[in-house]
Amino acid sequence: MLVIYAKLEISARDRVEIEDIRQRFDRLQGRVEPHFTLVFPFAGVPLDDVLDHARSIAAGVAPIPFRLAGVAAVPDPLSPAAHLFLLPDEGDQTISDLHDRLYSGVLARNLHPTAVYLPHVTVGRFERYEDAKTAAASLPAVDIPGRLSVMTIGDFDGEGVEDLHNVRLGAP
């Protein structure tokens, strides 16, 4: 399945902080870098069409500064599982707008009709919401500034992601 995401451009110190959390709580740690998912895994659209669409959208979007400042336990809307998210308090609306623009054109039919997008970096996955809440309460506050300047189209197999194409934001 294809997926579109943006890897975090952050300091080495902040990357270690995120990876330490992920090592404790995220089974995909080490298989995909910390990122914002912009288009969730999907099938049925040819890669060339996805690449053309992503390039078209990216050309009109400048690199996005953000700041991760919140930690939240969030129930999975499609299962009994839950996630541990780092949430931005800066850049979140711009990331949401990019997500919305990507889910147009050839990708419009892949938007889940009841899904509400919350920009986030996943740092934990849990079978039960209560476990995610406990993990969130155990973490110190975060303050991680960064930037997104590249979207990556990847091939997600359920266990990890293989990068296929990078698309630079703001590139004609």
Question: PLM features: residue spans?
Answer:
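Histidine-dependent nucleotide/RNA phosphoesterase domain, centered on the 2H-phosphoesterase fold
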Residues: 1-172
